[in-house]
Swiss-Prot record:
GO terms for molecular function: RNA binding; telomeric DNA binding. Residues 58-135 are annotated as: 8 X 8 AA tandem repeats of X-T-P-X-K-K-X-X. Nucleolin is the major nucleolar protein of growing eukaryotic cells. It is found associated with intranucleolar chromatin and pre-ribosomal particles. It induces chromatin decondensation by binding to histone H1. It is thought to play a role in pre-rRNA transcription and ribosome assembly. May play a role in the process of transcriptional elongation. Binds RNA oligonucleotides with 5'-UUAGGG-3' repeats more tightly than the telomeric single-stranded DNA 5'-TTAGGG-3' repeats. PROSITE patterns: RRM. The modification N6-acetyllysine is found at residues 9, 15-16, 96, 102, 109, 116, 124, 320, 350, 379, 400, 405, 429, 446, 469, 479, 515, 523, 574, 579, 648. There is a cross-link at K299, K326, K372, K379, K515, K579, K591, K626 (Glycyl lysine isopeptide (Lys-Gly) (interchain with G-Cter in SUMO2)). This is Nucleolin.
């Protein structure tokens, strides 16, 4: 290559060029223009003044790709082109610059590829720097790689500076739309040649890549494939390949980089299109999502029943179609002289609904058994509506104090009008409880009045309403369901752990219900509930049996107060405070002593670890805590009589809070300890933990004076 002067001497006044885009070309005496290229050329030529008659070798540009946002500007009048003194200046073919409105081609010399358009830097004096590593023609000399790298770096700087000129250059070109048509035809012919000769990239360096120009006003850049040079002498190409083998390697690397950039630009343009379509797709998807719930709601074809007398039909053969199932169901009922108004099949075809004309037909249909439709024995029952649970509760009774060995058949003999009987059991063992459901609420009320206190295998049963009716009953309610200040239930405490319900039944002969709470191991918790048919019976038992000895222990009896009774102690909570404990009492023993308790904690000395004689017992609900408190009032645990009280709720200074306060003379920590006690929220152990915090807070500058209370 010809080494171009980077800081040439000041040249004569340059010749001003016509409005861009135009090409710069020098006359070449030694090169000939091919006829095809002369036909293709449509741009204007500007001759750069030559100095000292020296001829510079023609430079050829390698492939270049310009991003849509980057424009290439030809030399402007402010730019002075300089050639190396002492050498003959040769024509430097300019690379064809294409705009959406006008295409300009530049004739190239024979044996040389068209050069890249000279890039001008406004206001900068010096030699015009050609594009990336140009190759010499027939008279070109090979240059060192260092000089080539310097040329590339300066060219990159010029390219960056020319970005500001792009908009001014594009607009004049857009006004000449008349010249665009011929150029476009030539470009189409040359595009075909480009496609055929893609495999000759390494041998033919005269090939140029597509240049993209961005139209003004933000329009999408049009891609135009420039013309490939024609009629290049093969012998000269081979000579150039031998001479510039090293340059080809560098050019190929640069070409690959340019191609990668072009591919990235195309990918960005392709990615923009789906983004525009996304809103529409989202709307369609949202519409589908909105429609989905409606489809889910419609589980049955024609969900609206035609009559008020409906029957649920289950276990249908879902392998059949809905019309087939409708016909089959209608035929089955028609054979039994039942007229079907309509049949509605579920979407899964596993169930359906049948509408009848009258309640009589519906009742007759419910009495049918063993009906088969397409080989499946269908299930018939009344449909379950929104209020079905409420209705079932109103016509259902709870029977308690049943013999543990009683069966459904035996109960069926007692409750003749019962529609369904469900025995309650746990781990395979009966709990002496059953639910008796009737067809109507009137039947349930009638049975409640007539069968209350009926004996079964020597045990007097107790009946209760379920649902809303049962909420108005006494805790151990009976026939008189509302509280009138006269309880019918006795709470028995200090009961021997070996005592059973059968043992108590022998003592309290008039009792209608007896319950001895047991722990997980089946061991008695030391208290019981004894219910009578009337307040008089309960009061009589209280007066005659209180402090009576049963299996070696003197029992204590008291009337049970109702939930929310004015006689109940104020501010109940879920936690009981228990004091008077033996030092030998463990947390497990304390927990087992209270029916329904979920955990228990005993407060211990932080230094010795021995019990302080009090603790806390937690329950799931206030009701459970109340019942346990009444049962264990003045009771004994491990031989010690205990005293019960409600644990103070948060904000009222629980016992643990006081412990924390005493331990926290260390300042702030002590205060935190007190609040920790309040945080016990009646759960005892947490209050003790507050005391522990008080001790820790007391540390620091002073020796802790509180005692650590450790739980769990």
């Amino acid at each position: 290559m010809v080494k171009l002067a980077k800081a040439g001497k000041n040249q004569g006044d340059p010749k001003k060029m016509a409005p861009p885009p135009k090409e710069v070309e020098e006359d070449s005496e030694d090169e000939e223009m091919s006829e095809d290229e002369e036909d293709d050329s449509s741009g204007e030529e500007v001759v750069i003044p030559q100095k000292k008659g020296k001829k510079a070798a023609a430079t050829s540009a390698k492939k270049v790709v310009v991003s849509p946002t980057k424009k290439v500007a030809v030399a402007t009048p402010a730019k002075k082109a300089a050639v190396t003194p002492g050498k003959k200046a040769a024509a430097t073919p300019a690379k064809k610059t294409v705009t959406p409105a006008k295409a300009v081609t530049t004739p190239g010399k024979k044996g040389a590829t068209p050069g890249k358009a000279l890039v001008a830097t406004p206001g900068k004096k010096g030699a015009a720097i050609p594009a990336k590593g140009a190759k010499n023609g027939k008279n070109a000399k090979k240059e060192d790689s260092d000089e080539e790298e310097e040329d590339d770096s300066e060219e990159d700087e010029d390219d960056d500076e020319d970005e500001d000129e792009d908009e001014d250059e594009i607009e004049p070109a857009a006004m000449k739309a008349a010249a665009a048509a011929p150029a476009s035809e030539d470009e189409d012919d040359e595009d075909d040649e480009d496609d055929e000769d893609e495999d000759d990239d390494e041998e033919d360096d005269s090939e140029e890549e597509a240049m993209e120009t961005t139209p003004a006003k933000g329009k999408k850049a049009a891609k135009v494939v420039p013309v490939k040079a024609k009629n290049v002498a093969e012998d000269e190409d081979e000579e150039e390949d031998d001479e510039d083998e090293d340059d080809d390697d560098d050019d190929d690397d640069d070409d690959e980089d340019d191609e990668d950039e072009d591919d990235e630009e195309e990918e960005e343009e392709e990615e923009e299109e789906p983004v525009k379509e996304a809103p529409g797709k989202r709307k369609k998807e949202m519409a589908k999502q909105k429609a989905a719930p409606e489809a889910k709601k419609q589980k049955v074809e024609g969900t609206e029943p035609t009559t008020a007398f409906n029957l649920f039909v289950g276990n249908l053969n879902f392998n059949k179609s809905a019309p087939e199932l409708k016909t089959g169901i209608s035929d089955v009922f028609a054979k039994n002289d039942l007229a079907v108004v309509d049949v509605r099949i579920g979407m899964t075809r596993k169930f359906g609904y049948v509408d009848f004309e009258s309640a009589e037909d519906l009742e007759k249909a419910l009495e049918l058994t063993g009906l088969k439709v397409f080989g499946n024995e269908i299930k018939l029952e009344k449909p379950k509506g929104k209020d079905s649970k409420k209705e079932r509760d109103a016509r259902t009774l709870l029977a308690k104090n049943l013999p543990y060995k009683v069966t459904q058949d035996e109960l069926k003999e007692v409750f003749e009008d019962a529609a369904e009987i469900r025995l309650v059991s746990k781990d395979g063992k009966s709990k002496g409880i059953a639910y008796i459901e009737f067809k109507t609420e009137a039947d349930a009320e009638k049975t409640f009045e007539e069968k209350q206190g009926t004996e079964i295998d020597g045990r007097s049963i107790s009946l209760y309403y379920t649902g809303e009716k049962g909420q108005n009953q006494d805790y151990r309610g009976g026939k008189n369901s509302t509280w009138s200040g006269e309880s019918k239930t006795l709470v028995l405490s200090n009961l021997s752990y070996s005592a059973t319900e059968e043992t108590l039944q022998e003592v309290f002969e008039k009792a209608t219900f007896i319950k001895v709470p047991q722990n997980q191991n089946g061991k008695s918790k030391g208290y019981a509930f004894i219910e009578f048919a009337s307040f008089e019976d309960a009061k009589e038992a209280l007066n005659s049996c209180n402090k009576r000895e049963i299996e070696g222990r003197a029992i204590r009896l008291e009337l049970q107060g109702p939930r929310g009774s004015p006689n109940a102690r104020s501010q109940p909570s879920k936690t009981l405070f228990v004091k008077g404990l033996s030092e030998d009492t463990t947390e497990e023993t304390l927990k087992e002593s209270f029916d329904g308790s979920v955990r228990a904690r005993i407060v211990t000395d932080r230094e010795t670890g021995s019990s302080k004689g009090f603790g806390f017992v937690d329950f799931n609900s206030e009701e459970d805590a109340k019942a346990a408190k009444e049962a264990m009032e003045d009771g004994e645990i491990d031989g010690n009589k205990v005293t019960l009280d409600w644990a103070k709720p948060k904000g009222e200074g629980g016992f643990g809070g006081r412990g924390g306060g005493r331990g926290g003379f260390g300042g702030r920590g002590g205060g935190r300890g007190g609040r920790g006690g309040f945080g016990g929220r009646g759960r005892g152990g947490f209050g003790g933990r507050g005391g522990f915090r008080g001790g820790r807070g007391g540390g620091g500058d002073h020796k802790p004076q509180g005692k650590k209370t450790k739980f769990e």
